[in-house]
Amino acid sequence: MVNLNIKAMRYLSAEDFRTLTAVEMGSRNHEVVPTNMINQIAKIRGGSCTKSLSVLFMHKLIAKVPHISYEGYRLTYAGYDYLALKALSKRASVYSVGNQIGVGKESDVYVVGDQKGKQYILKIHRLGRISFRSVKNNRDYLRNRKTGSWQYLSRLAATKEFAFMKILHEHGFPVPAPIDHSRHCIIMEMIDAFPLRAVTDIRDPPALYQTLMDIIVRFARNGLIHGDFNEFNIIVREDGTAVVIDFPQMVSTSHPDAQFYFDRDVQCIVQYFEKNYQYKGDVPNFEDISKMEKENNLDIMIEASGFNKKQSKELEKYRQEEEKRKENGDDLSDNYEEEEEEKE
């Protein structure tokens, strides 16, 4: 897990952020960015980033990698967090960062506030958490990997989720209102609700079951399938109304495996209500829904908004690689940031 510690942010100078941005830019083509390249990109007066590099390294916003043939630095998760939060704070979307309220394999969730004290949710996507130490024992992993770097993948996931959330909200779906996003971070509406898995007393299970199935069907009639529709990604308000969250795995109904994803979403709800409430309701059929007239083609509208098929395929390829890795039993650590071998 990567801890979000923003205490150093207020003490970083404009030159420090310029240097950090230079490392980010160099990371597009280099896992470890040569120091001379950082100097060239940053273009700091005097020509040297030495002082800023020392400050950034001290705060673990960049890191050195041992056993390479040149001097250079890589961007850490913390460094990428700082760049995103700096951009969001400049746009007045974030003023303060509060408690962490969620952590997953691919994201961390925090409460944040704006200058007026209004609270929002900050979701930080963290795809591709890989330990260099583990990779040393799995040498073929990076060589054979077809997808991009962790920061690129995380940014893609955030871009996708924000695009889907925005268009769904605009069309009246029960999703959080999207506020802003930068790089791998999303700011969204904070909703007073609890995950379905944590709600032990649902007033009317049949009604909620039908509501959730109606949402799945409505997604499909608008050209979309959630792809991960389960008790972890549905939150329930005190009045019993449901809100859907978490959209990085959403796919079009034209996807080759659309029926598989649709049926999986449906069965997640069926099994949850059978297990927890001994209730079994009607089950929608993908073929029947496919024959209905579509309400909208939101999948096409999403692509027009900027998240295209190429990006979607890159994310899907990453997820397929991760599934294969799990099937092969590869044990790659999630702790990418704090390896003993990287300390000096």
Curated annotation (Swiss-Prot):
Its main location: cytoplasm. Its cofactor is Mg(2+). Residues 330-344 have a biased composition (Acidic residues). Residues 311-344 are annotated as: Disordered. Its EC number is 2.7.11.1. The active site is at residue 228. Gene3D superfamilies: Phosphorylase Kinase, domain 1 (3.30.200.20), Transferase(Phosphotransferase) domain 1 (1.10.510.10), Winged helix-like DNA-binding domain superfamily/Winged helix DNA-binding domain (1.10.10.10). GO terms for cellular component: cytosol; nucleus; preribosome, small subunit precursor. Keywords: ATP-binding, Cytoplasm, Kinase, Magnesium, Metal-binding, Nucleotide-binding, Nucleus, Phosphoprotein, Ribosome biogenesis, Serine/threonine-protein kinase, Transferase. Disulfide bonds: none annotated. One of its GO terms (molecular function) is ATP binding. It holds the Pfam family Rio2_N. The keyword NADP does not apply. It is found in: Cytoplasm; Nucleus. Residues 95-250 form the Protein kinase domain. Residues 311-329 have a biased composition (Basic and acidic residues). It catalyses: L-seryl-[protein] + ATP = O-phospho-L-seryl-[protein] + ADP + H(+); L-threonyl-[protein] + ATP = O-phospho-L-threonyl-[protein] + ADP + H(+). InterPro entries: Kinase-like_dom_sf, Rio2, RIO2_wHTH_N, RIO_dom, RIO_kinase, RIO_kinase_CS, WH-like_DNA-bd_sf, WH_DNA-bd_sf. ATP binds at residue 123. One of its GO terms (biological process) is maturation of SSU-rRNA. Belongs to the protein kinase superfamily. RIO-type Ser/Thr kinase family. PANTHER family: SER/THR-PROTEIN KINASE RIO2 (PTHR45852), SERINE_THREONINE-PROTEIN KINASE RIO2 (PTHR45852:SF1). Component of a late pre-40S ribosomal particle. Required for the final endonucleolytic cleavage of 20S pre-rRNA at site D in the cytoplasm, converting it into the mature 18S rRNA. Involved in normal export of the pre-40S particles from the nucleus to the cytoplasm. This is Serine/threonine-protein kinase rio2. It comes from Schizosaccharomyces pombe (strain 972 / ATCC 24843). The gene is rio2.
